């Protein structure tokens, strides 16, 4: 759920500067900072061909021991939130890769614009700015998302640093939570773990294409981390999710965190470090148990 009520005054702040953000987070005690994560992860700007065009994205993997290294790691696809691929998500991709994964962070709006799709003065409470992003999202049909997910996993699987013998993961933030659910169904043979972070009420709708109705078609374990203000607006979502997981016989954790929609993304107006770190820890446990 991404609207002006859930995202009051959400703007692009100075921490969208890669250098400044890295220095700030690296200095935070007890936090795996951006600078540290990037020192342990290699990144490459890539273009992923899809049936609908060409997606700009960033590929991350742990720094190998040298050009002759034959190390391989499980693949993970990251769907950003409605503000798209930007420095915060690059840093999150690097952090995950440093933990032993080959990670692809995509521009979900490639059909409409090259990333980044927001500037330093972006304000989500501005109706015109918000309408531009929702227009980008509207260009992503369900069939298109399914095609994208298949293309992204195929791209990951041809990388020399991807361990195709292990299941892949997919995680999404805000609108990306629903996209992660769709991806798990579209590439059911590959996805073993799904993470949704402040996916909001878009995970359960009254429409026939509701993401929660896809759960039975997947072969994954789930971690669903809901925001407290999303839950307050519709407390029934968590219960419907739990019921859907139980009916499908899927392993799943559904929890409401003590933080607001968007809390996992560093640099955001509602970033909550303590709850974000807890989400990282739970994601690590999900992938360790299921990307095997």
Regions inferred by a protein language model and the residue ranges of each:
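Primarily recognizes the serine-hydrolase "nucleophile elbow" in alpha/beta-hydrolase
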Residues: 149-211
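N-terminal cap/lid segment of alpha/beta-hydrolase-fold proteins
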Residues: 35-68
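Short beta-strand element of the alpha/beta-hydrolase
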Residues: 70-81
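N-terminal secretory signal peptides
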Residues: 1-16
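Gly/Ser-rich "nucleophile elbow"/oxyanion-hole loop immediately N-terminal to the catalytic nucleophile
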Residues: 121-169
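Short beta-strand/loop motif that positions the catalytic acidic residue
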Residues: 218, 224-226
């Amino acid at each position: 759920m991404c609207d002006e009520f859930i995202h009051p005054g959400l703007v692009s702040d100075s921490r969208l500067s890669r250098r400044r953000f890295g220095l700030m987070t690296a200095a935070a005690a007890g936090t795996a900072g951006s600078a540290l994560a990037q020192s342990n992860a290699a990144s490459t700007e890539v273009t992923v061909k899809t049936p609908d065009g060409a997606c700009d994205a960033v590929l991350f993997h742990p720094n190998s021991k040298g050009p002759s290294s034959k190390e391989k790691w499980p693949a993970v696809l990251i769907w950003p939130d409605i503000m798209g691929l930007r420095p915060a998500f690059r840093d999150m991709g690097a952090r995950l890769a440093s933990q032993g994964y080959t990670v692809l962070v995509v521009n979900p709006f490639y059909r409409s614009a090259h990333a980044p799709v927001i500037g330093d003065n972006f304000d989500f409470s501005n109706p015109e700015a918000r309408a531009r992003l929702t227009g980008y999202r509207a260009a992503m049909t369900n069939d298109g998302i399914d095609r994208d997910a298949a293309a992204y996993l195929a791209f990951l699987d041809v990388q020399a640093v991807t361990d195709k013998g292990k299941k892949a993961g997919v995680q999404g933030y805000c609108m990306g939570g629903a996209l992660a659910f769709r991806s798990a169904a579209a590439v059911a043979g590959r996805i073993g773990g799904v993470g949704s972070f402040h996916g909001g009420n878009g995970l359960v709708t009254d429409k026939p294409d509701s993401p929660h109705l896809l759960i039975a078609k997947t072969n994954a374990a789930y971690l669903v981390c809901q925001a407290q203000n999303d839950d307050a607006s519709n407390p029934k979502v968590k219960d419907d999710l739990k019921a859907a997981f139980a009916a499908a016989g899927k392993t799943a954790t559904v929890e409401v965190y003590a933080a607001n929609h968007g809390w996992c993304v560093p640099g955001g107006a509602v970033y909550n470090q303590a709850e974000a770190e807890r989400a990282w820890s739970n994601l690590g446990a999900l992938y360790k148990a299921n990307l095997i």
